[in-house]
């Protein structure tokens, strides 16, 4: 009984929203009836359909009979030229490796802030090599931006 009232209340809200000129369902959306008078909204995403019911991520689409993805036609990734120096420009000692234990909750004593401080103490050049090492050894662009700001603030304020 309570569920029926919730469903009916949902219809009243939807009808009121349509009457007020609010956002209407777009064409790929459709409402299907459930047994007992309820309904649910079903969205169709043409790019996400998989004919066999499974999605395959990280693989290229290859047509049957095509030579595009045949084994042996592409060189292995390890044999491709790297396009850059094989050794890092600013190698870090083991105690200065980027942290792996961040909880991502925005702590005031974040391990990444401590990492930026250790880089500044190690290089002691006003932050230039610390910023370069940061660019080279930290993969996440958001963390890089945060740490860049921390290093720049630390060098401006003098510690």
UniProtKB/Swiss-Prot annotation:
<dbReference type="InterPro" id="IPR039251">
    <property type="entry name" value="OXLD1"/>
</dbReference>
<feature type="domain" description="Oxidoreductase-like">
    <location>
        <begin position="91"/>
        <end position="120"/>
    </location>
</feature>
<protein>
    <recommendedName>
        <fullName>Oxidoreductase-like domain-containing protein 1</fullName>
    </recommendedName>
</protein>
<dbReference type="Pfam" id="PF09791">
    <property type="entry name" value="Oxidored-like"/>
</dbReference>
<feature type="region of interest" description="Disordered">
    <location>
        <begin position="36"/>
        <end position="91"/>
    </location>
</feature>
<feature type="compositionally biased region" description="Basic and acidic residues">
    <location>
        <begin position="52"/>
        <end position="63"/>
    </location>
</feature>
<dbReference type="GO" id="GO:0005739">
    <property type="term" value="C:mitochondrion"/>
</dbReference>
<dbReference type="InterPro" id="IPR019180">
    <property type="entry name" value="Oxidoreductase-like_N"/>
</dbReference>
């Amino acid at each position: 009984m309570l569920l029926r009232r919730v469903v009916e209340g949902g219809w009243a809200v939807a009808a009121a929203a349509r009457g007020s000129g609010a956002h209407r369902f777009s064409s790929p959306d459709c409402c299907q009836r459930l047994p007992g008078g309820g309904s649910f909204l079903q969205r169709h995403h043409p790019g996400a359909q998989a004919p066999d019911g499974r999605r395959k991520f990280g693989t290229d689409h290859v047509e049957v009979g095509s030579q595009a993805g045949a084994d042996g036609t592409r060189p292995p990734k390890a044999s491709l030229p790297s396009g850059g120096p094989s050794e890092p420009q600013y190698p870090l000692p083991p105690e200065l490796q980027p942290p792996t234990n961040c909880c991502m909750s925005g702590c005031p004593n974040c391990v990444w802030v401590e990492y930026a401080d250790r880089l500044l103490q190690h290089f002691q050049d006003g932050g230039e090599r610390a910023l370069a090492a940061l660019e080279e050894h930290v993969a996440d662009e958001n963390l890089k931006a945060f740490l860049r700001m921390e290093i720049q603030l630390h060098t401006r304020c003098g510690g």
